[in-house]
Amino acid sequence: MIQLDDVCFAYDDRPILSHLTETIEPGQAVLLSGPNGSGKSTLLRLLNGLIFPQQGTYSFDGTIITAGKMRDHAYSKWFHQRVGYVWQNPNSQLFCSSVREELAFGPVQMGLKPADIRQRVDDALELLGLTRLASRPPYTLSGGEKKRTAIASILTMNPQVWTMDEPESYLDADGLAWLEDFLPSLKAAGKTLIIASHHADRLGSLIDKELVVRGS
């Protein structure tokens, strides 16, 4: 369970999140909506333990997430196995020397057996249509190929919670059609989805509730 209690966050003196209180139950699909600059991306970074409330608390499965907690290597590893983050711009997410290495990075950090890692990577490459690109450096890919690689790199970790910032960005028509099938399959598998998007119409009946992020 994710619990936000009176969460506030500001950049310099500019309030971004203001007294946000919300509970997200396991298996729910939540749409984060609001205008550009309202704090949707900031909230996603906070949910991933990259930044922390300046007031109030964020709890994940009953544990309050703080900078000190995330400096605990064992806890940070446990947390990041359970919460995955697909960035809006895949260039912010991809850093390995090949697509295959990108998809293997998370499972390697999780300590999975080599055979299990290969299976996860091969399955994700096939599902995302990336098999022919497996040896390519991510920087040589098109925007849509990068975005699919970014999604696949989270898929191989199989997190319980998927946080996504504009997951449809960079995708072409075929990629969007694939995404519209993929997201319901995650929900059917019991995953929690937290999606920032300006395209609620594409999410249809997937969404259980909408959280309007209003900034200050």
Q: Model regions: which residues?
A:
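The feature captures the beta-strand-to-loop junction immediately N-terminal to the Walker
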Residues: 33-35
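Helix-to-loop junction immediately C-terminal to a conserved catalytic motif
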Residues: 48
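Conserved ABC transporter NBD signature motif
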Residues: 56-68, 79
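Conserved ABC ATPase "signature" region
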Residues: 115-133
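Conserved ABC ATPase signature
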Residues: 137-141, 145
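Catalytic Walker B motif of ABC-type/P-loop ATPase nucleotide-binding domains
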Residues: 162-166
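H-loop/switch region of ABC-family ATPase nucleotide-binding domains
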Residues: 197-198
